[in-house]
Amino acid sequence: MNILLLGGSGFIGRHLAARLRACGHQVQTPTHKELDLRALDERAARACLRGQDAVVNAVGIMSRDADRLETVHHHAPATLAAWAREAGVARWLQVSALGADAWHPVAFLGSKGRGDEAVRAQLATDIVRPSVVYGRGGKSCELFIRLARLPLLVLPEGGRQMLQPVHVYDVADGVAALLAASSRNATLNMSGGRALSLAAYLNTLRATLHGKTAARVLPLPLLAPFLPLTNYLSDGMVSAATLRLLADGSCADNRDFTALLGRAPLAPEQFAAADVVGF
């Protein structure tokens, strides 16, 4: 299959490209200069779409700029999907995010949800919605790994927020399996093999990656006054919006994901070993 992979240089995209190529697909991964979703060039985009059987959109950004999120997650994919339909592309696979919804008040999930709906209105679209993704090189994952080294974890609400992290290898395997399936217009949550609190997740990483005993966890009661600064310094990575996402939790039923993989997705305590083995 000829596949145009958007976001192929990103964290998830790199793993998707490797897995899809290993499955025998011809994968085109345009650079930002060749295809920039912040300012689409129609001629360049149509050239990239020509001759493709499928498009996989793995573009996702965190930003404090809501307009930028709307452009990259919603308007650009909608336009590309229309051009893809005109080019005869048969299907589109959208890598979204768990909880994405057009009406979500958090700009990241709202823009993702609106993009999902806009693309699906144009052509047959499978949507996958990963939970918090673990994998070396991912910005949020590396932040968690650095935090896990600390002997004292000072976390919002004491780290009681519930997560169900998924390994990027499982995300890549799931995308490859979905493209190989005959179904169209599937919506699939991708969550890992075990749900646990943020504090427990960090201590799991601490044990499996750093070989250390559990850290002491204390609540962080006075973060709110500093959120405008952390939002600016992290470009949206640490903000009131991300804290709300944490508070809402990131867990989902993974029975359909398990069926697609043909096995249970990895649990957090298995992540480090999977890193050693690789794909």
Spell out what each predicted region is.
Residues 205-249:
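Terminal hydrophobic/aromatic helix or amphipathic segment near a protein terminus
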Residues 131-163:
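NAD(P)-dependent short-chain dehydrogenase/reductase
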Residues 96, 117-137, 146:
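Conserved beta-loop-beta element that borders a ligand/cofactor-binding pocket
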Residues 248-279:
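Amphipathic terminal alpha-helices
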Residues 162-169, 188-208, 217-228, 264-267:
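Substrate-binding strand-loop-helix patch
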Residues 37-79, 83-86, 98-102:
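NAD(P)H-binding glycine-rich loop region in Rossmannoid oxidoreductase-like domains
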